[in-house]
Amino acid sequence: MRFYTLLVLLLMAGGVTMQGQVRSEMYELLPESRSIKVGDVNNDGFVDVVVSRFNSPDNEVIFSIYLNDGEGHLECHENISSSKPSLHMCYEQPQLFFLLEDFDMDGNIDIASYVYADYEGMLDDTCYFRINYNNGYGRFDRFTETALILPEVIWWNNQPYYLNNPYYLGLVSGDFNGDLFPDVAVANDYHANTISALGYAYNDGTGNFDTDFLMGSLHVPVVSDLNNDSKDDIVDGANIIYSTDSLIPRYEYLHSNVYDGYSSNGMVVFDIDGDGWKDVVEGRSDYNSHLYSHLWVFKNLRDETFQKMDSVAFSMPITGYDISPNTMKLVNYNGDEHPDIIIQLGDYRIRAGYWGYYVFEGNGTFEFGSPVYFPLENETNEFVRHFDVCDLNDDGFDDLLVMHTKWTGESWLEVFMNDGYGFDAIEENDSNSTVTCSPNPANDYVYINGIEPAEVQVYNALGQVVKRVRNSNEISVDGLAEGGYLVRIADAEGRIFMEKVMVR
């Protein structure tokens, strides 16, 4: 097992500086925004953005459609209201799952979501699976609903299991029966029930669905065809839920669910070594100290078994799945042919903080090198942070889109463009850099040379901002523990320089 910390990364990297000017943009969102997805909504060849928002006073979900002008600039095109009488959604719910898929097979991306019937006073556990259909121009003029009625009891292995909570549904899409139409898998609250119900909504190709519930869960679900039988399967933590011709899923194990003090907080599935079979990378975080995480890398042995190939340990936890779905994603970070992995960092305990992103660059093998760190500090009262990645300006590199929401409801979207040097356009500095920090190591003050700083931020090994200085080239290290720190320096023109500093 290999272990990486931010300090190790800094010591290996040396000084760093920005190459050119990188554009980042900020967009104000409707209050109480909850999650974000990307897709070409209006069929113009450019990736657009969809943001979900929960309007608590009116008990409605709103989807905001942001169209891309082709250069990466976004503009709000439409707000879609999905109101329904007597809906109930918990205000503190940190995510609203939704899907972007062409459910009626007309060539246009539709929006699938769910709404709840008011639980108070209800005798059943009724939810509704809703699809807002796209007319091809980014307008959503009609919708349909399918009732998802949880059975009172599910029999499994000749044992009855009782269900009583419909909230916090998870949604994933895939072709689970091999008919080439996108289906939906939906699960009720994983935490409120000892046993949860996994429902499959099978699409007939027109957007009409038949539903069936059985035992299961969707805790950290990723959909992919793992056994090459032309039917999508679900990887859910340590479990693999294989689709079958009988439509009754078969449960196997990615690995034995060993209690090791780590919880499964993320997962990506892709063909790592190019052999035509999908492999699995699982993210696991320490839920005791909240300081460390692992990447477990598994090779698909082609017989529905997997071999653990590597374990990469690193500092800082992965954001908990209950707080932010899809905390691990595949990303084209450096423009080569190998998929990379981006991970959102932050304490999985809600309200405890977000710290930025790690990128593990793929190389076609089952070993990943030291991660690239992109710090993005926690905002005051930040409640929800979700992200997605896509190539907004069609330059061959995926950009980073981060949605923030505060407890007060204030929400905004931050876009970081990747010009080939990363989201912050940071690469290793050379010996001709004019920006330096001295003395280094330091025990009193650090002085920034070669630039007039507008703002200086000092990050510790956990990615937390521990010092902030404006309009000064003098930084006191008083109160800082001995060790390595990352100094981020911004000038008045928006250029970013980064240096490592050791404190003695």
Residue ranges, per PLM feature:
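Blade-edge motifs of beta-propeller repeat domains
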Residues: 19-32, 67-93, 133-165, 201-217, ...
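C-terminal tail/sorting-segment detector
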Residues: 482-504
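Glycine-aliphatic tripeptides that mark coil-to-beta-strand junctions in extracellular
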Residues: 45-47, 107-109, 180-182, 230-232, ...
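Hydrophobic beta-strand segments that make up the repeating blades of beta-propeller
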Residues: 49-53, 111-115, 184-188, 234-237, ...
